[in-house]
């Protein structure tokens, strides 16, 4: 079946509000960092004075410079270096005594630059900085019930950095304060210590009589007494002083270096407490403290409201720029200490700014952030969608955030304020559920870090779609009635119907159209990019939609991408914003095209070259490849797509293939979600993907001399070297299989490495046998493929190598993987399964016109999982296949009328039947079902079957990467049991429960073998191997090593444990004898080597 689809029929009369650039969040944040964040940080540390105050070092931050990066993006990837710029800051050193001023530009460190795709290249690997969602600084009020059942309130003042301040009331109507979670002291003490008199305190409170109780209970404090009391509480055990108290209070809350509310904190405080302090006041003031106590007391009188900490108005997003700024602060902190020390130690005449400023602490801080922070992640590059989603991810984990163990249900749960901001569907399954989310489609992050979402205004029940949408934060929309994007309107935008569902004050209710204030701009505004690529999403259960969203990110790019027959209309934007397709920057004419570059000449006659990426390896070992879409002489406009990337076709995202599916059981081969497929999918390379793996070896300098990359490898015949060049490196284009040598390497070997026979030869003849050992890079078990690239890096060529390495060789092996039994495939609706059998085409069920089915799915996978969207997709795809059209259906289509999905699908199927003249395509009696014939017998099945075209993806969980076997292999040092896992060439663990199963069956000998000779009886297993090689009977097992370890552990606890056996003596009496369980322990710790004697000599002796 060939699918030549040309005309696209978009069924949806919705003019979607254009989606913003999807990775704007990354770019805008980094731009902010370069323009403001870095300058702000440097300014906050300038000037740095020494302890005497004689010397001052000023950073003139606004004039900082970035030098050109050393290598381009491509070159950085090739050389395993970072794509970074050097930062230079003009500095001024002022000597107060002599009045001398020295100015210099000082290097302060390397700053990794963001590529235009929103990623960073660190040591040759693309990384993404994930956005973090944290509690916003500000003041939070909470009500609690104490032991006596009385409601009390507390207020927490949380800064960006610095000490927390917590006020609380108790059952006796007293007001207390805690500083940084220490012991509580009376609020009066804090206020008096700030130098406030009774009159000032009472004037600023709405209910001064409430606070009067606190003063009466505690008695009056003067300012000095209060300071002493404060010092006693915060520093118990030290003699209190008034100066000490003042200094303590000032440094905790009023010192800019130690306490910072941040712009956000100030904004939130002003909003909540109705203050008018300027944005520049980033420390606490007396007004803040008084106002927060006032609000707290008002709560006791039911004035004001408590805060919900999971509300998105109280959580903010920290993107790259801010996370990097925080890290630079850490570096500058260390730098400041170093500068102070140097100022004190050195002679002031000889000092220059360059000698003072050491870039190391800043470089280390930046390196640590990009290299090992929890939020700096290896980019998921499986396909363009995975890449895009990774950059829009929002995590509550990481430094300053939550931890998995401590996060409860409330934090993970969907909150009404998530609407249009964070996707309620896309989140991982497992321990991170709800802690990691994805930004919704139209969401933006504002300058304070709060997520905003756009709405159209509504006047008198009419939606003003011609106006610019208004972006709103979560707290701005709390008191408004907001309707969803899929309500029915007429051509003028008037809302139809009498009842409209709205969100109002964190609640989902209904109202009449006149009361509606705003309407969402699009039905897919609620969900993320991946979720909005699922057609008929509204017919799927949320759990399955979640799996569908997550599995689209795991789809492997296929050899011949095929865009879906049934899509949602967001595919082009997802492809374009992922950065995988090549987009023109100017209008013009294509002057040159080949597979590696496209040139465009603009109106002014300037030529722009667009290089294409050919068969590059991605982070996940999939293949990145671009193919031109334009021809020489074509006219192009700015923003037009010139070339497709991997998993895109015709500038649209194409993650899978359109295949003919039938929902029917077939001989039990699709039991429990297994999937039966036709051989056509193998022969026609429908699901064939290319995977490129990288193998690396370095030649190091050892104590005994340098390692050598060479062809001269001991004990390897010419056959093993046939594909190596004269240097001993494999040639490009060679086909290799497991065990083949990729790079020959020999390592010098010391005296101790020599076997006894070699020592003997040397003793007799005094000659040196060639003392090197083979340490070559070989193809690992179960791998095969073709060499596509070889890169050699040496010191001589000026490459940067790891310390101790003289030469690094990198070999890239490409494999073509056809689909096979054991591979995982899935649809977009969370319907996943493993391929259980590949049937010959002639055995597959076929349609009345003889077309064989491609994939047979189990119908029982639908009802209990409630992902009915797959049925709609499958039938609409069937209509599209016959009519040769594609459909774009935006999810949530009931705004076009009730039951719209079903109506449309039926309409299109009827149209397909009438246009094709094949009556069997749509049967009114069983709509959507077709009589299907058994390919083996030619008989018709006993009932009609749902058949259609579904879009199925092949996922990255390939059986080739998982299959594994072990005969002999490495053992763990302590327990002497085989290691686990494919990477360690490990065994299959026969665990506690499996042992119970064998015990239940009484399979004693099998069990004994499993626990001894197949596992950790060291002597027994060597003897058993020997016996197997020689064809003898397997000897009796000994004591397992792990049992001996247990005995030793018990003995180390001073428990004398011994085993006794009862023996009968000659005179018929019995006595017990102690058995030494350690007896069979050989003298050496290492197991004796099995002795391989040839079987023939054995036979001759008999």
Curated annotation (Swiss-Prot):
Q: Name one GO biological process term.
A: DNA-templated transcription
InterPro entries hit by this protein: DNA-dir_RNA_pol_bsu_ext_1_sf, DNA-dir_RNA_pol_bsu_external_1, DNA-dir_RNA_pol_su2, DNA-dir_RNAP_su2_dom, DNA-dir_RNAP_su2_hyb_sf, RNA_pol_bsu_bac, RNA_pol_bsu_CS, RNA_pol_bsu_protrusion
Record's catalysed reaction(s): RNA(n) + a ribonucleoside 5'-triphosphate = RNA(n+1) + diphosphate
Task: Report the EC code(s) recorded for this entry.
Answer: 2.7.7.6
Q: What would be an example GO MF term here?
A: DNA binding
Q: Which UniProt keywords apply?
A: DNA-directed RNA polymerase, Nucleotidyltransferase, Transcription, Transferase
Source organism, top-level taxon: Bacteria
Pfam families assigned: RNA_pol_Rpb2_1 (PF04563), RNA_pol_Rpb2_2 (PF04561), RNA_pol_Rpb2_3 (PF04565), RNA_pol_Rpb2_45 (PF10385), RNA_pol_Rpb2_6 (PF00562), RNA_pol_Rpb2_7 (PF04560)
Region: Disordered; residue ranges are 1081-1102
Q: What's any one GO cellular component for it?
A: DNA-directed RNA polymerase complex
Provide the family line.
Answer: Belongs to the RNA polymerase beta chain family.
Subunit and partners: In cyanobacteria the RNAP catalytic core is composed of 2 alpha, 1 beta, 1 beta', 1 gamma and 1 omega subunit. When a sigma factor is associated with the core the holoenzyme is formed, which can initiate transcription.
Job description of the protein? DNA-dependent RNA polymerase catalyzes the transcription of DNA into RNA using the four ribonucleoside triphosphates as substrates.
Q: Which PANTHER family match?
A: DNA-DIRECTED RNA POLYMERASE I SUBUNIT 2
Q: Per its record, how is this protein called by name?
A: DNA-directed RNA polymerase subunit beta
Q: Which organism is it from?
A: Trichodesmium erythraeum (strain IMS101)
Lineage of the organism: Bacteria, Bacillati, Cyanobacteriota, Cyanophyceae, Oscillatoriophycideae
């Amino acid at each position: 079946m060939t699918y030549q689809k040309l005309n696209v029929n978009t069924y949806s009369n919705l003019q979607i509000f254009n989606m913003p650039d999807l990775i704007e969040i990354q770019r805008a944040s980094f731009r902010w960092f370069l323009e403001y964040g870095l300058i702000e940080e440097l300014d906050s540390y300038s000037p740095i004075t020494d302890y005497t105050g004689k010397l001052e070092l000023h950073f003139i931050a606004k004039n900082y410079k970035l030098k050109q990066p050393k290598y381009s993006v491509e070159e950085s990837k090739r050389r395993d270096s970072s794509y970074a710029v050097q930062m230079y800051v003009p500095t001024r050193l002022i000597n107060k005594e002599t009045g001398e001023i020295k100015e210099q530009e000082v290097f302060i460190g390397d700053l990794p630059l963001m590529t235009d795709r929103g990623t960073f290249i660190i040591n040759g690997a693309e990384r993404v900085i994930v956005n973090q969602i944290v509690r916003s600084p500000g003041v939070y009020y909470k009500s609690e019930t104490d032991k006596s059942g009385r409601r009390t309130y507390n207020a927490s003042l949380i800064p960006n950095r610095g000490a927390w301040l917590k006020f609380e009331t108790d059952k006796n109507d007293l007001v207390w304060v805690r500083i940084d979670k220490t012991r509580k002291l009376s609020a009066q003490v804090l206020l008096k210590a700030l130098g406030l008199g009774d009159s000032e305190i009472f004037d600023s409170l709405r209910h001064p009589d409430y606070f009067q109780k606190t003063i009466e209970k505690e008695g009056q404090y003067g300012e000095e007494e209060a300071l002493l009391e404060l010092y006693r509480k915060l520093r118990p055990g030290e003699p209190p002083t008034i100066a000490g108290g003042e200094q303590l209070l000032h440094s905790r809350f009023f010192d800019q270096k130690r306490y910072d509310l941040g712009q956000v904190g100030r904004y939130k405080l002003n909003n909540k407490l109705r203050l008018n302090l300027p944005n520049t006041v980033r420390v606490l003031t007396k007004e803040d403290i008084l106002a927060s106590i006032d609000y707290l007391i008002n709560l006791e009188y039911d004035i004001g409201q408590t805060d919900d900490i999971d509300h998105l108005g109280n959580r903010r997003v920290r993107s790259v720029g801010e996370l990097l700024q925080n890290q630079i602060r850490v570096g500058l902190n260390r730098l400041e200490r170093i500068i102070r020390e140097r100022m004190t130690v050195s002679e002031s005449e000889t000092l220059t700014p360059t000698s003072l400023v050491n870039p190391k602490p800043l470089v280390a801080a930046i390196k640590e952030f990009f290299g090992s922070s929890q939020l700096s992640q290896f980019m998921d590059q499986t396909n363009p969608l995975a890449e895009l989603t990774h950059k829009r991810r929002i995590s509550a984990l990481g430094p300053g955030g939550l931890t998995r163990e401590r996060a409860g249900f409330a934090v993970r749960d969907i909150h009404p304020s998530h609407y249009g901001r964070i996707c309620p569907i896309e989140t991982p399954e497992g321990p991170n559920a709800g802690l990691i989310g994805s930004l919704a489609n139209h969401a933006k992050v504002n300058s304070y870090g709060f997520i905003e979402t756009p709405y159209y205004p509504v006047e008198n029940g009419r939606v003003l779609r011609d106006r610019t949408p208004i972006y709103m934060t979560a707290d701005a929309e709390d008191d408004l009635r907001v309707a969803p994007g899929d309500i029915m309107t007429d051509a003028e935008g008037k809302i139809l119907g009498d009842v409209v569902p709205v969100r109002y004050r964190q609640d989902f209710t209904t109202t009449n159209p006149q009361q509606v204030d705003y309407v969402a701009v699009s039905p897919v505004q609620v969900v993320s990019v991946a979720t909005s690529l699922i057609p008929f999403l509204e017919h799927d259960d949320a759990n399955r939609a979640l799996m569908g969203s997550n599995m689209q990110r795991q789809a492997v790019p296929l050899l011949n991408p095929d865009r879906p027959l049934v899509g949602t209309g967001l595919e082009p934007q997802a492809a374009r914003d992922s950065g995988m397709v090549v987009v023109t920057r100017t209008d013009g004419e294509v002057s040159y095209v080949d597979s590696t570059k496209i040139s465009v000449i603009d109106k002014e006659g300037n030529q722009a070259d667009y290089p294409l990426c050919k068969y590059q390896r991605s982070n996940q070992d999939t293949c990145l490849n671009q193919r031109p879409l334009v021809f020489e002489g074509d006219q192009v406009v700015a923003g037009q797509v010139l070339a497709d990337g991997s998993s895109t076709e015709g500038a649209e995202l194409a993650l899978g293939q359109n295949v003919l599916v039938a929902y029917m059981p077939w001989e039990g081969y699709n039991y429990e979600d297994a999937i039966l497929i036709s051989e056509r999918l193998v022969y026609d390379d429908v699901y064939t993907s290319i995977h490129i793996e990288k193998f690396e070896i370095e030649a190091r300098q050892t104590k005994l001399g340098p390692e050598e990359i060479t062809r001269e490898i001991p004990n390897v015949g010419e056959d093993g070297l046939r594909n190596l060049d004269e240097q001993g490196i494999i040639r490009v284009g060679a086909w290799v299989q497991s065990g083949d040598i990729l790079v020959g390497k020999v390592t010098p070997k010391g005296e101790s490495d020599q076997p006894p026979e070699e020592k003997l030869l040397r003793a007799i003849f005094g000659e040196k046998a060639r003392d090197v050992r083979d340490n070559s890079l070989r193809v690992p078990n179960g791998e095969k493929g073709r060499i596509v690239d070889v890169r050699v890096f040496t010191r001589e060529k000026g490459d940067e190598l790891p310390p101790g390495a003289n030469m690094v060789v990198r070999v890239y092996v490409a494999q073509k993987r056809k689909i096979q039994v054991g591979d995982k495939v899935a649809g977009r609706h969370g319907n996943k399964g493993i391929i259980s059998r590949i049937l010959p085409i002639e055995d597959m069920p076929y349609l009345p016109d003889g077309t064989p089915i491609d994939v047979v799915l189990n119908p029982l996978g639908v009802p209990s999982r409630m992902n009915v969207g797959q049925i709609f997709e499958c039938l609409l795809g069937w209509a599209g296949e016959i009519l040769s059209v594609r459909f774009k259906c935006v999810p949530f289509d009931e705004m076009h009328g009730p039951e719209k999905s079903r109506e449309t699908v039926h309409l299109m199927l009827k149209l397909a039947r009438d246009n094709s003249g094949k009556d069997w395509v749509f049967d009114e009696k069983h709509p959507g079902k077709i009589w299907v014939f058994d390919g083996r017998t030619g008989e018709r099945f006993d009932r009609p079957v749902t058949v259609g075209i579904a879009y199925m993806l092949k996922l990255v969980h390939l059986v080739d990467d998982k299959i594994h076997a072990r005969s002999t292999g490495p053992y763990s040092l302590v327990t002497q049991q085989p290691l686990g896992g494919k990477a360690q060439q490990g065994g299959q663990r026969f665990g506690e429960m499996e042992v119970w199963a064998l015990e239940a069956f009484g399979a004693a000998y099998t069990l004994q073998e499993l626990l001894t000779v197949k596992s950790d009886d060291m002597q027994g297993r060597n003897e058993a191997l020997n016996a197997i090689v020689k064809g003898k009977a397997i000897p009796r097992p000994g004591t397992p090593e792990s049992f001996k370890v247990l005995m030793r552990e018990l003995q180390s606890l001073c428990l004398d444990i011994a085993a006794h056996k009862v023996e009968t003596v000659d005179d018929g009496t019995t006595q017990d004898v102690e058995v030494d369980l350690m007896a069979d322990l050989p003298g050496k710790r290492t197991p004796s080597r099995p002795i391989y004697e040839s079987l023939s000599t054995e036979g001759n002796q008999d």
